[in-house]
């Protein structure tokens, strides 16, 4: 587990809820792989989660990963909130059910297979990996398919 897989993810939605898409760019040893998908009625947060989940599910073995997102919801959720949610039986600090629990549980399971560092960048600020993931997510909404 010495080589690092760089992953850039983004989610997009036209309306919230509305048609949504997600995109991911994976970079490893000079090679790139792009992934994207869409749902007809979803939220931006669900698309952010799906981008990370599908990117991590694509990895064929345990890896060191640097995952970069422009979603504070995703980064804060996985690095800060998740352990508390699990300890409380998947309830928030206000004792409410965690939103998007199906995706958080799926992300928790797939993330446990890897050694991941989570990074946040401000969206639409010209970060090349984030811009490509954003373009994939927006294109997926228009094309409505998984690639």
Swiss-Prot record:
Principal location listed in the UniProt entry: cytoplasm
Record keyword Ribonucleoprotein present: no
Any one GO CC term of the record: cytoplasm
InterPro entries: RNase_H, RNaseH-like_sf, RNaseH_domain, RNaseH_sf, RNaseHI
Gene3D superfamilies tied to this protein: Ribonuclease H-like superfamily/Ribonuclease H (3.30.420.10)
GO-annotated biological processes: DNA replication, removal of RNA primer
Enzymatic class: hydrolase
Cofactor binding note of this UniProt entry: Binds 1 Mg(2+) ion per subunit. May bind a second metal ion at a regulatory site, or after substrate binding.
Catalytic activity: Endonucleolytic cleavage to 5'-phosphomonoester
CDD domains linked to this entry: RNase_HI_prokaryote_like
Function: Endonuclease that specifically degrades the RNA of RNA-DNA hybrids.
Family of the protein in this entry: Belongs to the RNase H family.
Subunit structure: Monomer.
Designated name of the protein: Ribonuclease H
Lineage: Bacteria, Pseudomonadati, Pseudomonadota, Gammaproteobacteria, Chromatiales
Chain's gene name: rnhA
């Amino acid at each position: 587990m010495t080589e690092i897989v760089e992953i850039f993810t983004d989610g997009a939605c036209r309306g919230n809820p509305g048609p949504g898409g997600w995109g991911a760019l994976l970079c490893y040893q000079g090679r790139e792989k792009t992934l994207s998908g869409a749902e007809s009625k979803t939220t931006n947060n669900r698309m952010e989660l799906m981008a990370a989940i599908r990117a991590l599910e694509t990895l064929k073995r345990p890896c060191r990963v640097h995952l970069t997102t422009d979603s504070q919801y995703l980064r804060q959720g996985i690095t800060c909130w998740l352990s508390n949610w699990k300890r409380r039986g998947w309830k928030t600090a206000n004792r409410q059910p965690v939103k998007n629990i199906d995706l958080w549980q799926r992300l928790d399971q797939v993330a446990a297979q890897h050694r991941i560092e989570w990074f946040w960048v401000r969206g639409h600020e010209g970060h090349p990996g984030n811009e490509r993931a954003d373009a994939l997510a927006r294109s997926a909404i228009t094309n409505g398919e998984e690639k």
